[in-house]
Every structure is written in C-alpha cells, then in structure tokens.
Design a protein with these regions (language model features):
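Glycine-rich, low-complexity intrinsically disordered segments
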Residues: 1-192
Length: 192
C-alpha cells in the first residue's frame, strides 16, 4: 500500500486500470416477446445502435432496525432492485417505439384493460455490456469488461416524445423503464 508521501499523480496513473471505464462505451440488447407479431431480427439489429443511454443497475438491501436497551442493531433486510431505464433514439420507422408500445399493450390493452396474464409470456431478458477502449485492430470485436443480465424484464413505462415547433437540430428520443426479477453480473470469464 502506498504511503501518504507516495500518493501522487504518477502513482494515481499506475492505479487507474485501463485508463478508467468510460460511460459512453456500452451496448444494450433486449429480447422481445415473440407473441408481439413483429420482426424480431430488425429490432434486435437496431437496439444496440439506437439505445443512446442506459444504466448499470442499482440494488438495495433493506434495513431492519432491532432496538436493544436504547441502541439499535441494524440487520440486513430483503433485497430490492430499482427499475432499469434506457433512452432510445427514435428513427422514422418507429420500429423500437412500436415494439415497446405493443409489448406494453400486450400486458394491459389500452382499450379493454385485458392482456397477457402469464409472466412467463410477457417477461423477457436484457443485457447491458460495459465495453473496453482496448482493441488491437480496427474491426476487432469489442472487449466486454463486465455484463449485466436482466431476467424477467417488461416495460413499466414507455415515455412521451415531446413535439415542439421550436425544437431545431434535434432527433426524437424517448425513455423506457423496465421492471425485472433480478440481474446477474457476468465477467468475460464467467459469473463473479
């Protein structure tokens, strides 16, 4: 361990593995239900390019305060997962927007309030991959530093797309927030 006198910019540089993970080097894949009647190949090809923003998920452990003689013993409670949100660039064929709306509508129809009741049918999976800057040759596949696999996702919210006469030099985008059962963290060599 470095002593206080050894903590300098050169030592910091040597500790920053890979030059630091970059927030703009990521890729998202989302599996859509086959029952939607849409071209899954077209959507799967576009998602990694048009998902503009995502997040590495949060998870939380609840807290159970147990009082004892004027003190409180904090005991770990149950795990919960925050919803996962992605931001999607909208192109003129609306293919991803259409798929998200159909997926949401298949769960609870806009007009009839009926829909698919079996989670096995409407819940799917997704991945967010943190990519490395490292590459030896142009065209080499990206190196994955870490991957998060979401199980049991479904769209909870498909956001609005603001329209505005004054909006110049902009491409439409929208957000989708997913609920999910859990996620797994995967390294390039297997589970952590």
């Amino acid at each position: 361990m470095a002593t206080f006198n050894q903590r300098n910019i050169t030592e910091f540089r040597s500790r920053l593995a890979g030059g630091g993970a970059r927030a703009n080097l990521f890729e998202v894949e989302i599996a859509f239900p086959e029952e939607l009647g849409i071209n899954l190949t077209d959507i799967s090809d576009k998602v990694p390019f048009l998902v503009k923003a995502a997040e590495i998920p949060a998870s939380n452990l609840g807290n159970i305060p147990v009082p004892y003689r004027g003190r409180v013993l904090p005991v770990a409670g149950d795990r919960t997962f925050d919803p996962w949100t992605v931001t999607i660039i909208n192109d003129t064929d609306f293919i991803i927007r259409d798929a998200m709306e159909k997926w949401s509508n298949s769960i609870n129809d806009l007009q009839t309030a009926q829909g698919t009741i079996s989670p096995e049918v409407y819940q799917r999976s997704a991945q967010v991959k943190q990519l490395s800057r490292e590459g030896t040759n142009p065209g080499d596949p990206e190196k994955v530093l870490r991957m998060y696999n979401f199980e049991g996702i479904y769209p909870n919210t498909v956001s609005n797309i603001p329209l505005d006469f004054g909006a110049t030099d902009q491409i439409e985008e929208f957000q989708v927030t997913f609920n999910y059962l859990f996620y797994e963290v995967v390294s390039p060599t297997g589970n952590f």
